[in-house]
Structure formats: structure tokens, C-alpha cells
Design a protein with these regions (language model features):
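Glycine-rich helix-loop-beta junction characteristic of Rossmann-like nucleotide cofactor-binding loops
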Residues: 15-21, 79-80
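Class I SAM-dependent methyltransferase SAM/SAH-binding core
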Residues: 27-78
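A short acidic, Gly/Pro-enriched loop at the edge of an enzyme's catalytic core
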Residues: 77-88
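A short SAM/SAH-binding and catalytic strip from SAM-dependent methyltransferases
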Residues: 87-100
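A short glycine-rich, Lys/Arg-flanked "PGG" loop and its adjoining helix->strand segment in the class I
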Residues: 102-117
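C-terminal alpha-helical "lid/dimerization" subdomain adjacent to the S-adenosyl-L-methionine
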Residues: 119-174, 178, 183
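C-terminal lobe and adjacent flexible extensions of AdoMet/dcAdoMet transferase-like proteins
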Residues: 184-190
């Protein structure tokens, strides 16, 4: 399903920016059907796939099995995980679904261990209001400088927010639109 929105190069960009190692515990926020989870599970010791939708999690379980992936139902703005409990946080197309993206980033920073890494991709700002109804989008993307500010506000270091070469494509009434995406990465101080 997700391949119709964006390509494998988005997954590769997020996973490369996250610098996952074989000893890492990775949290995939807004894991959905496992777009990033699958790639992270090939590298990491353990992956926690968090999504608010039981249906998405069930689809991911059917596709990936359980193996070294732990599936959890939950809200990214209020995660039921201990402080400093994961080495890496990854996410794709999650921030624009939450009312308080700054709170979501604060939670991601909270659960990261000192020295841990975060890498998330999402939509840049756009004006396609119909996505609010068709895809349950709360935000119509973000300005990259706003994402940079949210990450710095949460005391993350080495923050980078760059435009991805890939776009998110969606169709309404036979009109295909391409929305630019960004990749944000950072590190929690030691």
C-alpha cells in the first residue's frame, strides 16, 4: 500500500541517517504496516513497532511475523516506554498525523538513550486540504526550519533537516500530486 505514496529510497535514507547497529534497540514510531520496521529488523537486535492503529499493527505482524519485533499499540505523544530506553528512533510520515508534533519529538527524545539517534521523514508544507479527510492528516506538512527548531528545542544535537530527493505522491479525482519530503536527523547528548 505505502509503495504507491513513496519509494524504497525513503526507507534507505531514514535507515542510513539512523546509523543502526546490530546491538541497537530501535523504536519505529508510527510503524504502520512495517515500511521501516522491516529494514530495521534486518540490522538491529530488537525493534519496537509502535502505532496507534491495531489494524496497521495486525497487517505488519502478518507481513513480518514477530521475530525480533515487538508490536505495541500507542500514541507517539504519550509513549508507554521508560526514559532512555532505546538507542534509535525512526519514523516515516508520522508527525503530520499528530496534533502536537513538538510533543511527539519531545517523547522521541525522552525515550532515547544518551548518544542515541533519531531519523524521521515527513511531508514538507503544502496546500492539499483534501488530505485531511482522505488520509487523516492533521498537518499539511511542515517547514523544514520549524522541524529544525522543534528538534533543537528538545535539546537534540547535530540536527540536520534536508529535502529528500523523493516525493510523496497521492491522487485525488485522477489528479496525481507530488509533495516534497524532508529527512530530519539528530543525536541526544551524552
Amino acid at each position: 500500500m505505502r509503495k504507491s505514496f513513496y519509494g524504497e529510497e525513503v526507507r534507505d535514507a531514514v535507515l542510513n541517517a539512523a546509523q543502526i547497529s546490530p546491538d541497537d534497540t530501535v523504536l519505529d514510531v508510527g510503524a504502520g504496516t512495517g515500511f521501516l520496521t522491516q529494514g530495521a529488523a534486518m540490522i538491529a537486535r530488537k525493534v519496537i513497532a509502535l502505532d496507534f492503529s491495531r489494524g496497521m499493527s495486525d497487517e505488519s505482524i502478518a507481513k513480518l511475523g514477530r521475530g525480533k519485533v515487538e508490536f505495541r499499540i500507542g500514541n507517539v505523544e504519550h509513549m508507554q516506554l521508560p526514559d532512555s530506553s532505546v538507542n534509535v528512533v525512526i519514523g516515516n510520515m508520522v508527525l503530520h498525523h499528530y496534533p502536537h508534533p513538538d510533543m511527539a519529538i519531545a517523547e522521541m527524545a525522552r525515550v532515547l538513550k544518551p548518544g542515541g539517534r533519531i531519523a524521521i521523514s515527513d511531508l514538507q508544507g503544502h496546500n492539499y486540504e483534501w488530505l485531511r479527510k482522505e488520509h487523516a492528516d492533521v498537518w499539511l506538512g511542515f517547514k523544514m526550519e520549524d522541524v529544525l527548531a522543534m528538534m533543537k528545542k528538545n535539546r537534540l544535537e547535530d540536527v540536520k533537516v534536508d529535502e529528500l530527493s523523493s516525493c510523496c505522491t497521492s491522487t485525488q479525482e485522477e489528479q496525481q500530486v507530488k509533495i516534497p519530503m524532508f529527512l530530519a536527523s539528530a543525536r541526544k547528548p551524552v
